[in-house]
Amino acid sequence: MDKQTIKIQISCEIGVRYLIETTTKIEDIIGYNALFNSLQKCKKGVGWKSTTGYYIHNWNTELLKMEEELSDGTYQKRKPKFFMITEPKVREIMSIHFRDRIYIRSFNDNALYPQITRSLIPDNFACQKGKGTLSARERFRDFIRDFYRKNGIEGYALTCDIKGYYPNMNRKFVKNMVTQYVDPLTDKLIQAEIDYHPGDIGFNPGEQTIQNIGILALNKMDHYIKERLRIKYYIRYMDDFVLLHPDKEYLEKAHCEIKNILKTQDMALNPKKTFIQPITNKIAFLGYDYRLLDTGKVIATVKPESITHAKRKMKRMMLLTLKDKRRKRDVDVYFKSWKASLRF
């Protein structure tokens, strides 16, 4: 069967059989109410687009049709579209049809996300409710302050970045990994979702399911660092993470251990972005440079490239606005959100 048109077999009989084994109910994923709630979330900010306008206008008919197709196993996801972005780096992004996004949102919000997040460490900050870049930056700043109170300025930081995080993910590893964290029904659906993505190695970031896989993929490493290596000051945001410790040799040991763990997942650290340095040096994390002064004060400054990126994006958006291909409101919203992200 063509992976692009793979059928997601989730008949009501299958759902009933799994009710005995799991807390996830099929109605919580493909029921009308679940799909309606998902639609309300998916249409935010995109209702003006022509590609979604028809579906939103005929939402009741379309939701009933989707519910029926999902129940009898005739639902087929449409072929995704691909496009390139150049900022902050050149990469290909996959975009799925609005109709399919509704099912994906319902599946993730009502089944996958609640199950995988139960086992995550508190200092894993990516793509989770109540977390994000702002809270991650605040947490990292608090880490540095607390480190100073206990160790002074004598310490080191191991900054790490994974080379090609999503593109290099091992599909077989991901399938086996997810099975360990979810119930049988959710596992059946997530396996179908993984098979839907084209290619044999890696994933294309641009879909909620893959983002959730990205949250979970390094969970084993997270627990190893926190519980086996007992490094208190460890924080991760997707594939960027930092470890603070007073002993440089211990961080070198941790570096080797991390490389070994990643090797079992066919991943590797980016040598250009992975290094150990004194804690008083500038430590880069999530678009900011952190500097610990002798007095214990922590100075956080926006990285110059982050400002350059924002200026370029606003310039492109304004050019599209002048050509009537973009609304001026979108530029204002982006500027306000970017400005707000600088406050912490």
Can you say where each PLM-predicted feature lies in the sequence?
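Non-catalytic, polymerase-adjacent accessory regions of viral genome-replication enzymes
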Residues: 1-64
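Active-site-proximal segment of RNA-dependent polymerases
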Residues: 2-7, 13-17, 21-25, 110-167
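Right-hand nucleic-acid polymerase module
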Residues: 3-6, 96-97, 101, 105, ...
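Glycine-/proline-rich flexible loop or hinge segments
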Residues: 41-53, 83-94, 121-123
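Conserved polymerase palm-domain catalytic core
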Residues: 62, 69, 138-238, 242-259, ...
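Reverse-transcriptase-like RNA-dependent polymerase core
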Residues: 69-89, 102, 183-196
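Short Gly/Ser/Thr- and Asp/Glu-enriched loop/turn motifs at secondary-structure junctions
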Residues: 80, 235-239, 271-272
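Conserved pre-motif C helix in the palm subdomain of viral-like polymerases
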Residues: 90-121, 199-226
